[in-house]
Amino acid sequence: DKRLKIFSFLSIKETTSILDVGCGAGRLLYALKEAGVKKLLGVDPFNEKDIQYENGLKVQKKEIHEIKSKWDVITFHHSFEHIPNPAETLETVANLLADNGRCVIRIPIVPCYAWEHYGVNWVQLDAPRHFFLHSIKSMNILAAKVGLEIYKVDYDSIALQFKGSELYLKDIPLMAGRSKTSIFSMREKRAFKKHAKKLNENKQGDQAVFYLKI
């Protein structure tokens, strides 16, 4: 899981407490629980109900604003862009972070090559599900308003920016049956992956990971 890579920068231990916001079924947290991390919680208001796993992991049908305890790490893996009140949410994050705590936010960003190239067919535009598309500047402004600092940004875009956008250009829904039986050749897929890597190196990828601290 690519999301696990972000923890390599955070010195995660068994005792590190992690809150994952907008976690869905909690697959990432489940992997961390199996790896030995003890204090984990997932929250997602769009789940049908609370989830309790056999290994002790809990995923609650809640908003982050309903959480009261402090956390060493708070993560948003492509959930922050679905939140209608990002400023208030970041303020809550600032209040919930423990001393020396960290927040990790993975989101699509602009400007980027994919937006400039595909325009309204850019797969990450995703209206109306994405309330906001942030830039490095807007994220820094939001963070500063609530007393947080962005200390690291990594571009982590993937081939989806091409595959998904090309499907939209052809008027094929992303989740349509024929989009799963790929219309792209192996050569095209390799080219998409290579292009995504190059864009990340040049800070032109269509998504990034923001690391924040108090």
What are these regions (language model features)?
Residues 2-120, 128-145, 207-214:
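Conserved SAM-binding loop
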